[in-house]
């Protein structure tokens, strides 16, 4: 019997075909960034104030500067900084009356401007920005600010539902079909969102994008890890995520060039239409085909891979035939993720680690609050932090295995959060350095959980297992804003204490998982259950059988 990994040793483990396929799927990974973090630019909140009829005309007549206009016509902050009248309240004054002067125009109406009545922003807002965002177009500020939270929550809800549902479809009907379907829906809904006339329609199409986009990203990850040989599996998995980081850098540049949200949304959606050509470029996974007892199709793709790689299959491999003793096709089931003790343990630990990675990754970004007024540069610099994390993984994963670097990265992230609690604000650079160390640690953990998750499940439920477990990071993404902002109201450093506890627990749980370094991907439930023990060559229905007489002598 030969496994797919054995066959790839003959067809090429990472030759021209795999490199071409990796490049194509890496583009898909980079294109996912506008959906995952696009809210930074699509939902940008500029300085704003209530629109008051007559103020613009009075300012023009008097020749005021912007600072003078704000000083004369906009309320200042309330007592002890409570509330925000500058953004959400306006003077109940008729600015069109001719008695108003150009120097302190409110002096004749009240001895002190603080005694003037204030009212809500009945006429909308004025935004100090040359561009536009969904906030400025739909006035998602003040009493409506929660609608921006709902917009981001909707995409995370979509991630959660889509990861589970589409994960099942991908294992049931194939990786390629599901990938193309998610690309098409993502492209169409992205364009429709860009031309949405109302907030409600925009929210609906963003939810649809969430339903398919993350699932498509994960299917691309599964595909590339199933196409390459054992020795290259971890490398392409890491660089697939590095492609996401490159997408962050590109997004910053595109957003800078296109400050209007509709044009930005339309531009970042266009590549998805190009990805539909993958129908002719990316074949179905041979591993999935074999797991579904479609060995003829699998053999055809294997020959195609060998041809693209300039390899010739040995005569023994030309006579491959399916095991005739058992021909039942394996069908994925959610119960397979918890039915047996070891896989159940793997599932629970992986779900917790996905949750932890999302909470710490997004939480540290929110809590750190990058200094500076240039949104685009801040975003660009924060993305650069992720490259050293990938480098450290590449340097350690083959030498130390998966478990120990993964556990250490969680521990470092948790310890950095805890240490930063006791570091004073001055010197500021020291505190930022420690928090960046935590960001690097949790970035490593995020990349490691993707890699190991795919290695712990048998082929016929691998896609389902990855997508179900990774759905917990969507739950983390939904609650993290509330976790950060509500706990900060109690004590500014309290979120960091929570992050530390969560991260340290995650590091300990990782040590309960089996080491996957140097092991072939499990093909059956039994193999996944016995990963801690040395693997024996057993005949499995998802292997390809070779007649002993056809095997050339050693």
UniProtKB/Swiss-Prot annotation:
The chain crosses the membrane at residues 22-42, 150-170, 177-197, 210-230, 238-258, 263-283, 348-368, 377-397, 404-424, 432-452, 464-484, 494-514. GO terms for molecular function: acetylcholine transmembrane transporter activity; monoamine transmembrane transporter activity; neurotransmitter transmembrane transporter activity; organic anion transmembrane transporter activity; organic cation transmembrane transporter activity; prostaglandin transmembrane transporter activity; putrescine transmembrane transporter activity; quaternary ammonium group transmembrane transporter activity. Coiled coil: none annotated. Glycans are attached at residue 71. Keywords: Cell membrane, Glycoprotein, Ion transport, Membrane, Transmembrane, Transmembrane helix, Transport. PROSITE patterns: MFS (PS50850), SUGAR_TRANSPORT_1 (PS00216). It catalyses: (R)-noradrenaline(out) = (R)-noradrenaline(in); (R)-adrenaline(out) = (R)-adrenaline(in); serotonin(out) = serotonin(in); dopamine(out) = dopamine(in). Its main location: membrane. It is a multi-pass membrane protein. Residues 43-149, 198-209, 259-262, 369-376, 425-431, 485-493 are extracellular. It comes from the Eukaryota. The keyword Transferase does not apply. Electrogenic voltage-dependent transporter that mediates the transport of a variety of organic cations such as endogenous bioactive amines, cationic drugs and xenobiotics. Functions as a Na(+)-independent, bidirectional uniporter. Cation cellular uptake or release is driven by the electrochemical potential, i.e. membrane potential and concentration gradient. However, may also engage electroneutral cation exchange when saturating concentrations of cation substrates are reached. Belongs to the major facilitator (TC 2.A.1) superfamily. Organic cation transporter (TC 2.A.1.19) family. This is Solute carrier family 22 member 2. The gene is SLC22A2.
């Amino acid at each position: 019997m030969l496994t797919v990994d054995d066959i790839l040793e003959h067809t090429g483990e990472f030759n021209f075909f795999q490199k071409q396929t990796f490049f194509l799927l890496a583009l898909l990974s980079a294109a996912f960034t506008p959906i995952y973090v696009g809210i930074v630019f699509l939902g940008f909140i500029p300085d704003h104030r209530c629109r008051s009829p007559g103020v613009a005309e009075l300012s023009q007549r008097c020749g005021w500067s912007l600072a003078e206009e704000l000083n004369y016509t906009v309320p200042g902050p309330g007592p002890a900084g409570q509330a925000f009248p500058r953004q959400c309240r306006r003077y109940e004054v008729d600015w069109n009356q001719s008695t108003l002067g150009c120097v302190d125009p409110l002096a004749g109406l009240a001895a002190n401007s603080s005694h003037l009545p204030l009212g809500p922003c009945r006429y909308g807002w004025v935004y100090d920005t040359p561009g536009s965002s969904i906030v400025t177009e739909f006035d998602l500020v003040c009493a409506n600010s929660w609608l921006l939270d709902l917009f981001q929550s909707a995409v995370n809800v979509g991630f959660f539902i889509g990861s589970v549902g589409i994960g099942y479809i991908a294992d049931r009907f194939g990786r390629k079909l599901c990938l193309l379907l998610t690309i098409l829906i993502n492209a169409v809904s992205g364009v429709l969102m860009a031309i949405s006339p109302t907030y409600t329609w925009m929210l609906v199409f963003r939810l649809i994008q969430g339903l398919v986009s993350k699932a498509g990203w994960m299917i691309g990850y599964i595909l590339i890890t199933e196409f390459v040989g054992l020795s290259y599996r971890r490398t392409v998995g890491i660089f697939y995520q590095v492609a996401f980081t490159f997408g962050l850098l590109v997004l910053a540049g595109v957003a800078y060039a296109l400050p209007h949200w509709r044009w930005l949304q339309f531009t970042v959606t266009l590549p998805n239409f190009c990805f539909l050509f993958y129908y002719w470029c990316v074949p179905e996974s041979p591993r999935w085909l074999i797991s579904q007892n479609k060995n003829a199709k699998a053999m055809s793709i294997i020959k195609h891979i060998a041809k693209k790689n300039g390899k010739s299959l040995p005569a023994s491999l030309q006579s491959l035939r399916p095991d005739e003793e058992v021909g039942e096709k394996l069908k994925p089931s959610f119960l397979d993720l918890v039915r047996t003790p070891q896989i159940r343990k793997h599932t629970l630990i992986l779900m917790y680690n996905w949750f932890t990675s999302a909470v710490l990754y997004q939480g540290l970004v929110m809590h750190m609050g990058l200094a500076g007024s240039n949104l685009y540069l801040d975003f660009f610099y924060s993305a650069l932090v992720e490259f050293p994390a990938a480098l450290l993984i590449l340097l350690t994963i083959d030498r130390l295995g998966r478990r120990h670097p993964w556990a250490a990265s969680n521990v470092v992230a948790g310890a950095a959060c805890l240490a930063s609690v006791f570091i004073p604000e001055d010197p500021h650079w020291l505190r930022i350095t420690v928090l960046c160390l935590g960001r690097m640690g949790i970035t490593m953990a995020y990349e490691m959980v993707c890699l190991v998750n795919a290695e712990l499940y048998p082929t016929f439920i691998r896609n389902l297992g990855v997508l179900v477990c990774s759905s917990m990071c969507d739950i983390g993404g939904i609650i993290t804003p509330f976790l950060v902002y509500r706990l900060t109201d109690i004590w500014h450093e309290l979120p960091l204490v929570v992050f530390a506890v969560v991260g340290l627990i995650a590091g300990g749980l990782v040590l309960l998982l089996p080491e996957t370094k140097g092991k072939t991907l499990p093909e059956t439930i039994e193999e996944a259950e016995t990963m801690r023990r040395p693997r024996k060559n057993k005949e499995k229905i998802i292997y390809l059988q070779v007649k002993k007489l056809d095997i050339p002598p050693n």
